[in-house]
Amino acid sequence: MGQCKYCGQDAGFFSHMHKECEEKHSQGLTILEGAIRSYFKGATPMSEIVRVASHVKQNNYISDKDRSASSSKCIDEWTNTIHWPFHSSHLDKIKEFISNIGVSYQDINESGALDRLCQKMIRGFMAEYFTGQKPLQRSLQISQQVMRTLPLTVQKEQEAYYEMLGQAGKNFLKDGLMSPSEQQKVDEYIGTLGLSLINLPPSLKGTPIEEMGQASILSDIQAGRTPRYNLQAPIILGRGETAFWCYNNVTMFQEKVRREYVGRTGGFSFRIIKGVTYRTGGFKGHPVETSYMENMGVGSLYVTNKHIIFMGQMRSIKVPYSKIIGINPFSDGMEVQRDGNNVKRLVFQGFDCTFILNVLALIN
């Protein structure tokens, strides 16, 4: 006999619940979630939520796990409805809810609902800095107050800061360049929060944050300055050489030449004695060369003020800018043509080469 997971009584063969118990449980979830939604809309006091939660627990088989899941669901819904500017009333409301709902913070946040709420509020406070409504220190102070109620890991905190930086970058780069005042704001932001525009995690590659870092470097090169952001690269640089950028997971291909002889065999054969045949003529042919691109492996492509440097597990190569006679850009890489005798073409694949083209244009 199966046992009902709600009331604990016999549920019959091959069954784990009574239909009426399941319906009562579903009704309880609807009642609880409706009350929580009403609370976040400001229409129901917290005392009523506590009463409803106790009632459905006793009469509708609502467990603490159910209460946590319903709380998480309704918090996500509330997070999607509130918008910047945020006020202390938002923080007071969630603080009151967490303190009185009767389940742990960790259980409510099992799916990350409280983290998402905190990150959204932090982005809002940082938006006030980028729009000139608050100094950065004040926005940071308010964010720290929020995180005392809604704690975040360092990783999730930085995710919120980076996401706001990306939104700011999208606005700043509408015309392709940042103004001096916008650059100053970005420098203060990343300097204060310990962020970077060049040593980015893979998830931020190809985002406005990467574009801002590249735009800042190009602006410094154009002005004759050493770029303000230092790239920590595991390569040996020459005297006066500075590393600007690094593209990871780049595949290098190098042109190879295959030579073979193509021709035909002429002449005829005749029998001399049994078992012995004599053949006249011979092979006439000519060499034919074909070129192909050989995969040289995956590695990192570094851009400096003097070279393009590829560091891979199978092969590494340094290409001086002075030896480059042409670059053919692709949507996902570039072909490099070099000066010199018997120098083969190189293809680098797996990145947007726009930044390299701009560096070459400014340096040369």
Predicted regions and their residues:
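Short, cysteine/histidine-rich loop/knuckle motifs that typically chelate Zn2+
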Residues: 5-8, 19-23
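Short Cys/His-rich "knuckle" micro-motifs
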Residues: 12-17, 28-30
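Short metal-binding segments enriched for Cys and/or His
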Residues: 25-37
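Structural recognition of alpha-solenoid helical scaffolds
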Residues: 31, 48, 52, 66-74, ...
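Short, recurring structural edge motifs at helix starts
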Residues: 35-43, 76-84, 124-133, 168-177
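Amphipathic, non-membrane alpha-helical rod segments
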Residues: 46-64, 77-105, 132-152, 178-199
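Anionic N-terminal interaction surfaces
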Residues: 139-144, 205-300
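Acidic, Ser/Thr- and proline-rich intrinsically disordered linker/docking segments
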Residues: 235, 297, 302, 309-364
